[in-house]
Amino acid sequence: MRKLRIGIVDLVARAPTRAIYSKVMNANLAGIMPQVLAVWCEELGHDPHVICYTGFEDLAAELPKDVDVVFVSAFSQSGQLAYAISNLFRQRGVVTVLGGPHARCYPEDAARFFDYVLGFTDKALVAEVLEERAPYPAGGRVMAAPKHPMELPSLEARWKYVERTLEKAPLIKFVPMIGSLGCPYTCSFCIDSTVEYQPLGFPQIAADLKFLLTKHKAPIVGWHDPNFGIRFDDYMTAIEQADPNHRIRHIVESSLSLLSEPNLKRLRANGVQAVLPGVESWYDMGNKSKTRRTGMDKVEQVAEQINMILRYIPYVQTNFVLGLDTDEGDEPFELTKKFVDLAPGAFPAYSLLSAFGRAAPMNLDYQRAGRVLPVPHHFLNNNHAMNVKPKNYDWPAFYDRLVDLTSYSFSGRAIMRRLPATPTFIPKWMNVIRAVSSEGWGRIKYHTMLRGRLDTDRELRGFLDGEHSKIPEFYRERVTRELGYFAEWLPKGALEHDQNAYLKSEAALVPIRARAGRAAPAA
């Protein structure tokens, strides 16, 4: 096979943005797999060109020219942008390939607009695609490896792609690393709940960290593990061996069950500066919390633990999912407000319940019940739309509570209380920037606007109530405006999708259950 010129587009952003927090952080959210893909393409004898779109570039100008194949990596929020990019390249005779979360969640829809749609991806699968590289105008080929790859290219092999992306980060630069794939927990709303936990090689982790120290004096590593520290001793030993002088700082997403005080002492000693635990709900949720308590008892226990974590780790973000079927009335929202008061140093990150196609076993139940709405992918970023009709609320009642909770959490009073409860300067600064930018005040403004439209926009309200499936003008206008130039390249029908495709597929003929969770190894 001749040497191919390959474009790889990592869509961190769904559209152009000018948000302060996005400017600071988006480059740090670059995916690892686009970089891995580039290394595999090199090893197969090809010439890859990687672009990470953060929302601040002129994407039309940066897209690679004169390529044979284009790979696009996208979350569902970038689905419409990905479809437009694919259409642009297909018009030029270029074969297009979609990977990433959107490909796994919506393969049937993505295959309408891409030649190849890849689920789990390994080097052999990439080689097969490049060998064939055939256009499929009548419907793309959906392919997947049997499971995640057992190993990934080293940080040294990825470095030139990491370095180019981090040049876009103006202040804080996170080097992306990963030590495990999948998750042992059983949260039925999570894309990893049915993916077997698979640690990658700890000797390779140590080697990567040693290499990183040859490039930066005091680097920050952003770990992409779905749940960092399941094999806690192995992680800590690898870090200690690679960085005995504790020059590296780490940011991790972990579960409360792993954040005991002895573990926190070791995390602090090894440079962990930020943790992002999932609270999810004040009711039982997949064994990710070490408590079996619910309601106010859980609020008090979790707040106590979060305050203890803040004595060791300077930055804590707590993750919540709003609109779950266990939520009813004012209580879950009032409990969260109480938590904000009891643990003022934690930054609360709220996600609206979303059913991302095939992402999670729970989505089948929502589809069987007729509760999933065909909201355009562009809005499925956990905040700009909720595509599952709430079980125990009508839309005005839900948004009244959402606006109230968000306003409470990012009020001037809450921001000021967060400052003294956060121990060091950079975390204080980050919390303020996030609160007054798109993640705090921006969401208050958006949720308030949408709540108002529920009373005045009959087309939108009817769509959200499931009375019709016609995409409301509200969504069409925003997609057109936000995509700008790329709106012209949206293929016909790109805003619509079959929200019940998972249910209709052959896989759904057999009941799918989240596999039984396994106890995490003792620390």
State each model region's role:
Residues R2-H216:
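Acidic, low-complexity intrinsically disordered segments
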Residues R14-R18, D109, Y185, R231-F232, ...:
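Flexible glycine/acidic-rich beta-alpha junction loops that bind and position SAM and/or redox cofactors
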Residues A38-D47, K215-H216, N270, Q305-V316, ...:
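A structural motif corresponding to the C-terminal end of an alpha-helix
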Residues D109-E128, N270-V275, T336-Y350:
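Structural recognition of alpha->loop->beta junctions
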Residues P153-T326, E334-K338:
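Radical SAM [4Fe-4S] cluster-binding motif and immediate context
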